[in-house]
Amino acid sequence: MSLVVPDNFQHILRLLNTNVDGKVKVMFAMTQIKGVGRRYANIVCKKADIDMSKRAGELTTEELERIVTIIQNPSQFKIPSWFLNRQKDINDGKSFQLLANNVDSKLREDLERLKKIQTHRGLRHALDLRVRGQHTKTTGRRGKTVGVSKKK
């Protein structure tokens, strides 16, 4: 960032219903959007032909629109399906990129489905226990029973 701030510099921009810091470089600014990581932000910048050394506040409205269309429609811009965060969806079998509030809602739907069909993972989630095979004999004892009190 140069010492003199240009006139059209935006300190906070609105991208996909998220406030993004304009002082950060473009790639890292996009990671503030839920569902967009550094790798996905990198490939979006390359597909949109945007200089990586630019700050997010220096982007023109046309460049911002390009970024938004690429993020929302990755398959049209030849981003491979293995790069997306939702592959082979259980309902329609398609792959797509979940963004912002959709990430939370899809996760909640998945957990509800697991609980409904009573899989092992779903039951562990329902009982608030560890799901991924961790040992639970000594750790994770929050809030269950109180320890033994010593006599005086």
Curated annotation (Swiss-Prot):
GO biological process entries: cytoplasmic translation; ribosome biogenesis
Pfam families linked: Ribosomal_S13
GO MF annotation: an example: rRNA binding
Subcellular location: Cytoplasm; Nucleus
One cellular component term from this protein's GO annotations in UniProt: small ribosomal subunit
InterPro entries: Rbsml_uS13_C (IPR027437), Ribosomal_uS13 (IPR001892), Ribosomal_uS13-like_H2TH (IPR010979), Ribosomal_uS13_CS (IPR018269)
Alphabetical UniProt keywords: Cytoplasm, Nucleus, Ribonucleoprotein, Ribosomal protein, RNA-binding, rRNA-binding
Protein family: Belongs to the universal ribosomal protein uS13 family.
NCBIfam families: PRK04053.1 (NF003140)
Any further remark recorded for this protein: There are 2 genes for uS13 in S.pombe.
HAMAP family documented for this protein: Ribosomal_uS13
Subunit field text: Component of the small ribosomal subunit (SSU). Mature yeast ribosomes consist of a small (40S) and a large (60S) subunit. The 40S small subunit contains 1 molecule of ribosomal RNA (18S rRNA) and at least 33 different proteins. The large 60S subunit contains 3 rRNA molecules (25S, 5.8S and 5S rRNA) and at least 46 different proteins.
Annotated function: Component of the ribosome, a large ribonucleoprotein complex responsible for the synthesis of proteins in the cell. The small ribosomal subunit (SSU) binds messenger RNAs (mRNAs) and translates the encoded message by selecting cognate aminoacyl-transfer RNA (tRNA) molecules. The large subunit (LSU) contains the ribosomal catalytic site termed the peptidyl transferase center (PTC), which catalyzes the formation of peptide bonds, thereby polymerizing the amino acids delivered by tRNAs into a polypeptide chain.
Name by which UniProt lists this protein: Small ribosomal subunit protein uS13B
Organism expressing this protein natively: Schizosaccharomyces pombe (strain 972 / ATCC 24843) (Fission yeast)
Source species taxonomy: Eukaryota, Fungi, Dikarya, Ascomycota, Taphrinomycotina
